[in-house]
Design a protein with these regions (language model features):
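Glycine-rich FAD pyrophosphate-binding loop
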Residues: 23-45
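Conserved small/polar residues in nucleotide/adenosyl-binding loops
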Residues: 119-121
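SH3/SH3-like beta-barrel fold
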Residues: 112-115
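N-terminal Rossmann-like FAD-binding beta1-loop-alpha1 element of flavoenzymes
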Residues: 4-30
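Helical element adjacent to the flavin cofactor pocket in flavoenzyme catalytic cores
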Residues: 77-94
Length: 121
C-alpha cells in the first residue's frame, strides 16, 4: 500500500493550484487524476468553448498567462495546454489514469483511498 499524508483528487485547475500551494510550502503530496491533466476540459467541453474572462486575467498561483493574445479568450485546447505547462512548471506530482472509487476512514482515523488501478493510498 502506498502512503502519503496529503492527497489532492483531481488534476484540473483547482487541483493543480492546490498542488502548487502545497509544494510551495514543502508539503509532500500526490495529485490523483482519472485521466490526463485537465481531463474534463479535454472530453467534457465543446470544441468551440472559450473562457469567459480575457487571457490576461487567467492566472494560477505562480503562473500567469504566457501567450501572445492577452485580450483574447482562450479556447478549450489552449486552456488544456496552459494547464499542462502549469503542471510541468513546478513538477506537479500527478498520478494520471487513476480514478478514485472510494474514500474510507480506518479505525485509526486515517483515510484510505481506493482506485480503479488497484492502488491503495
Amino acid at each position: 500500500m502506498n502512503s502519503v499524508d496529503t492527497v489532492v483528487v483531481g488534476g484540473g485547475h483547482a487541483g493543480l493550484a492546490m498542488s502548487y500551494c502545497l509544494a510551495d510550502r514543502g508539503v509532500e503530496h500526490l495529485v490523483i487524476e482519472r485521466g490526463d491533466v485537465g481531463q474534463r476540459w479535454r472530453d467534457e467541453r465543446w470544441e468551440s468553448i472559450t473562457l469567459l474572462t480575457p487571457n490576461w486575467a487567467t492566472q494560477l498561483p505562480g503562473f500567469h498567462y504566457d501567450g501572445d493574445d492577452p485580450d483574447g479568450f482562450e479556447g478549450r485546447d489552449g486552456y488544456v495546454s496552459y494547464l499542462e505547462r502549469y503542471a510541468r512548471s513546478f513538477g506537479a506530482p500527478v498520478q494520471k489514469h487513476t480514478a478514485v472509487t472510494r474514500v474510507t476512514v480506518t479505525a485509526q482515523g486515517a483515510y484510505l483511498l481506493d482506485t480503479l488501478s488497484l492502488i491503495h493510498i
